[in-house]
A protein has these predicted regions:
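Aromatic- and Lys/Arg-enriched surface recognition patch
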Residues: 57-128
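A short secondary-structure junction signal
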Residues: 12-13, 71, 106-108, 141-144
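A cross-family signal for N-terminal binding/gating loops and helix N-caps
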Residues: 2-8, 54-55, 74, 78
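Hydrophobic beta-strand signal
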Residues: 44-45, 60
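Short, charged beta-turn/beta-strand-edge "cap" motif at the junction between a beta-strand
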Residues: 46-53
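Compositionally biased, charged N-terminal/linker segments
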Residues: 1-39, 137-138, 145-146
Length: 146
């Protein structure tokens, strides 16, 4: 799961302990939250749009996707006038901090590792904030981050 550290970082998650993953406004990602992520699933925290881009830690899904409250807040940059409490358009899971990697696994490192040759993250034009990993890819990131 990708996030800009200027918005929310692995350090912020570590301090908070848990966090509702808000502000995602992409239907494909919303559907992943709703249909694929389950309590107990693990996820990689990935810092994007920063000097040091890469995988920085691990988190766990502790609550399945629920309506994102920012979609109803007219003062929020994530407000969606077409969304209603009866028919919310946007969802997000609640995650908890598991660990911070000792070593940032850079995008360059990921690109140069054959384990990730089919990973959407390294494909041209991919802008999704959530990318599915195979078990092998997940385990490799954990190993590289040690």
């Amino acid at each position: 799961m990708k996030c800009e550290p200027s918005e929310f970082s692995i350090d912020d998650l570590e301090r908070a302990g848990e966090y509702f993953w808000d502000g995602v406004r992409n239907y494909q990602v919303r559907n992943m939250f709703r249909d694929q992520m389950r309590v107990g699933d693990k996820a990689i925290f990935y810092h994007s749009s920063t000097k040091d881009v890469g995988a920085v830690g691990e988190m766990e899904i502790i609550k399945q996707a629920t309506p994102d409250p920012t979609q109803f807040d007219s003062k929020s940059k994530y407000f969606d006038a077409k969304s209603t409490t009866a028919n919310p358009r946007w969802l997000g899971p609640t995650v908890s901090f598991v660990k911070k990697f000792n070593h940032l696994v850079s995008l360059e490192e990921i690109k140069n590792d054959s384990t990730f040759s089919d990973l959407a993250l390294i494909k041209r034009g991919n802008r999704l904030s959530v990318i599915e990993l195979s078990k092998k890819q997940y385990e490799r990131l954990i190993k590289l981050g040690k």
